[in-house]
Regions:
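Alpha-helical transmembrane segments of multi-pass integral membrane proteins
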Residues: 233-234, 241, 265-376
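Membrane-cytosol interface segments of multi-pass membrane proteins
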Residues: 1-218, 320, 325-326, 346-390
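Conserved protein kinase catalytic core
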Residues: 59, 255, 339
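Hydrophobic alpha-helical segments of polytopic membrane proteins
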Residues: 179-196, 253-273
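Membrane-interface micro-motifs in multi-pass membrane enzymes
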Residues: 70, 158-166, 230-245, 290-294
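Loop-centered beta-sheet repeat module
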Residues: 196-204, 223-224, 236, 245
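Structural signal for the C-terminal ends of transmembrane alpha-helices
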Residues: 85-91, 122-123, 175-182, 245-255, ...
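Membrane-interface segments at the starts/ends of alpha-helical transmembrane spans
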Residues: 219-229, 351
Length: 390
């Protein structure tokens, strides 16, 4: 899965990944007002993905949500398209070089850190892969190309396949945003639904044909080359990303009052709660993974992209501050927690009774440290070095 994203991959004032977060100060000249509630949402999404990978005990009432939290990877891609378009779509000129360097500066330093921390995992990869697969993964993964090979998408850092998709989406964004888009809200809404439906066609065909010849309905533990292609290949997420861009344009075209946004936020959240409480376990996994809930997520984004009590709750400063670390949390949590458990760190420290919560806290602390001591300084250094010399 991933989030990223991916703005600050996971910065609403810049972009979103799965998995960066928005700033909350006054907008710079030429920039739109920040949307801190969307950063708060990222906090909730990222924590659910952590729980999906490492499910906490004694939270059975939340298991229907936690066990389906893979759906939030699509939410991150939706946010990525929305926030990028929100910030860049109406600029008269989009300097592609500056845009791509800015995206690289956000993603790659922490990505390299995640690979360095995960170096021990290469030993495990060596034992379960053929030599050809191992050395191919060793080339594809540092170059963010692993997502194009369904059998190696999770090589080295299981969750980092999402960055392969982000690279493709970022490469395409300057061209997508300059397409002649509809102007009216009704046509934009129709386009949004159409693009979403097109994105679900491959997943629907998979359900009808079952090309992997699975013995039963697919679930999170199922595997097969076609299913892995749908789950990990960058192409599978283009439509969700384009829905995000369309949603940003719809957001601009609509005239929505604060009360209407509140209704959208409460209504979409109520439907989502009802869905996870009642029918999520009876809904085909392949469709959920492919973005079945994207329209509901889109309504929620519209509801939170303005002033109302629900948006204010998600914009609470502690939640926003955590939201600014979600890219690092997403990228680092999987192998960090696995390594902590591999070496029985809580038990050796006499803190086994506090596990898994102390392990979650350690992963979060690492994400905070990486955000402030690696991601931001490295990004500033890259942008400074890439700036034209006067």
């Amino acid at each position: 899965m991933h989030p990223n994203h991916t703005g600050s991959s996971l910065n609403v004032s810049e972009e979103a990944v799965p998995l960066n977060a928005t700033t909350t100060g006054a907008p710079a000249p030429g920039r739109r007002p920040p949307l801190p509630a969307l950063t708060g949402v990222r906090t909730i999404l990222a924590l659910n993905i952590v729980f999906f990978h490492f499910t906490p005990p004694h939270m059975h009432y939340l298991y229907p949500l936690i066990n389906a939290s893979y759906v939030f990877v699509g939410f991150f891609f939706l946010l990525s398209g929305f926030v990028l378009a929100y910030n860049y779509a109406d600029r008269p000129v989009l300097d592609k070089r500056k845009f791509w360097i800015a995206r690289f500066a956000r993603l790659y330093p922490v990505y390299l850190l995640s690979l360095a921390i995960s170096f021990k995992m290469l030993q495990a990869e060596w034992h379960v892969r053929s030599h050809a697969q191992f050395f191919t993964g060793l080339v594809l993964t540092p170059t963010l190309m692993q997502g194009w090979n369904q059998s190696l998408a999770t090589f080295w850092n299981t969750v980092a396949w999402t960055l392969s998709a982000e690279v493709v989406l970022y490469a395409a964004f300057p061209y997508l945003v300059r397409i002649r888009w509809p102007k009216s809200a009704s046509r934009l809404a129709a386009l949004l639904i159409a693009v979403w439906a097109v994105g679900l066609i491959p997943h629907t065909l998979y359900l009808l044909i079952n090309p992997d010849h699975l013995p039963g309905p697919a679930n999170r533990y199922s595997s097969g080359p076609w299913l892995r292609t749908l789950k990990y290949t960058p192409i599978a997420y283009i439509c969700i990303f384009v829905v995000g861009i369309t949603l940003a344009k719809l957001h601009t075209a609509l005239s929505i009052s604060a009360r209407q946004r509140l209704a959208l936020a409460i209504g979409s959240m109520a439907v989502l709660v009802l869905f996870f409480a009642t029918v999520v376990t009876r809904t085909p996994y392949v469709l959920l993974h492919g973005g079945l809930l994207v329209p509901l997520f889109s309504v929620l984004v519209l509801g939170l992209s303005g002033q109302n009590v629900v948006a204010s709750a998600f914009a609470w400063r502690p939640i926003v501050l955590l939201g600014q670390t979600t890219f690092c949390l997403y990228l680092l949590h999987f192998n960090t927690i696995n390594l902590i458990r591999m070496y029985h760190v809580p038990q050796r420290l006499g803190l086994g009774a506090l596990d898994p919560w102390i392990t979650y806290a350690a992963a979060l602390a690492l994400a905070v440290a990486a955000t402030f001591w690696v991601e931001r300084p490295a990004r500033a250094w890259i942008l400074r070095k890439s700036a034209p010399q006067s």
